[in-house]
């Protein structure tokens, strides 16, 4: 039986976090939210709302102007770069791996923060598990350059799994993937049970994937809660300019959210 979110320990906590951009204009303003261990949190909002900025803060690529961030009870800014690499993995949009690497070699890069370029027996087992969990064992000897876009994204996810982080960050991981590959990728993350903060644009994928949703607009946290709360019709209309409604699945009766863009005139 899955433990309820409310009883799990807090993994990530942001308290009144702000980030200033050019001319001191706020890129993030007074963001406070938390994630429980094992939670999947979807971060959504229109372009320019601060989603990628928040990820860059969590990877310490950007510093905060005010506020603090704790990861597993420790101040994030107290951790060395090496220690952060052990604890936080990111699947970035602009990942450009060496396409001459074989899949298993690429996945093994996830162990570097822990043991450098040596590969002890336990690391080899973790790499095998990551390949297996992502369905890549049959492709382990293939060159990255010969993979499809979906297969290459799964390889990047396997590398992140092999890193065994406390927190997985996904920056629009389903971009450029076909519908089946999108659903499969998020399903792999869900089955792994890893604490995940994912920037997502594909609204229909959010409810099946996320435990909670944080909605950003113009650098502020507009709404934070369950998918039903965060993706209410009024919020979707206000933030994305789209209509939304709920229908029942024709086979199992579960609720399905439908999002509809207004016609252009």
Walk through the language-model features, giving the residues of each.
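Catalytic Walker B motif of ABC-type/P-loop ATPase nucleotide-binding domains
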Residues: 168-172, 177
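Conserved ABC ATPase "signature" region
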Residues: 108, 122-139
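ABC ATPase nucleotide-binding domains
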Residues: 233, 237-265
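Conserved ABC ATPase signature
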Residues: 143-147, 151
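Helix-to-loop junction immediately C-terminal to a conserved catalytic motif
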Residues: 59
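The feature captures the beta-strand-to-loop junction immediately N-terminal to the Walker
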Residues: 44-46
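Conserved ABC transporter NBD signature motif
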Residues: 67-75, 84
């Amino acid at each position: 039986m899955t433990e309820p979110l409310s009883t799990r320990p807090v993994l990530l906590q942001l308290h009144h976090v702000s980030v200033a951009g050019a001319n001191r204009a706020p890129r993030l303003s007074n963001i406070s939210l938390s994630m429980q261990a094992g939670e999947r949190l979807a971060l959504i909002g229109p372009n320019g709302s601060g989603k990628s900025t928040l990820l860059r803060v969590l990877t310490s690529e950007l510093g905060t102007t005010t506020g603090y961030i704790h990861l597993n009870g420790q101040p994030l800014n107290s951790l060395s770069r090496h220690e952060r690499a052990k604890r936080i993995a990111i699947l970035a949009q602009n990942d450009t791996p060496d396409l001459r690497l074989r899949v298993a070699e690429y996945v093994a890069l996830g162990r570097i923060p822990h043991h450098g370029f040596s590969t002890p027996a336990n690391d080899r087992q973790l790499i095998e598990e990551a390949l297996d969990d992502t369905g890549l064992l049959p492709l382990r000897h293939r060159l990255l350059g010969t993979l499809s876009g979906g297969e290459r994204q799964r390889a990047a996810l396997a590398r992140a799994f092999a890193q065994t982080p406390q927190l997985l960050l996904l920056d629009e991981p389903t971009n450029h993937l076909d519908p089946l590959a999108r659903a499969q990728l998020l399903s792999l993350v869900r089955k792994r049970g890893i604490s995940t903060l994912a920037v997502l644009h594909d609204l229909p994928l959010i409810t099946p994937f996320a435990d909670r949703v944080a909605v950003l607009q113009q650098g502020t946290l507009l709404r934070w809660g369950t998918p039903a709360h965060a993706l209410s019709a009024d919020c979707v209309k206000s933030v994305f300019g789209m209509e939304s409604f709920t229908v029942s699945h024709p086979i199992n009766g579960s609720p399905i959210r439908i999002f509809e863009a207004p016609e252009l005139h």
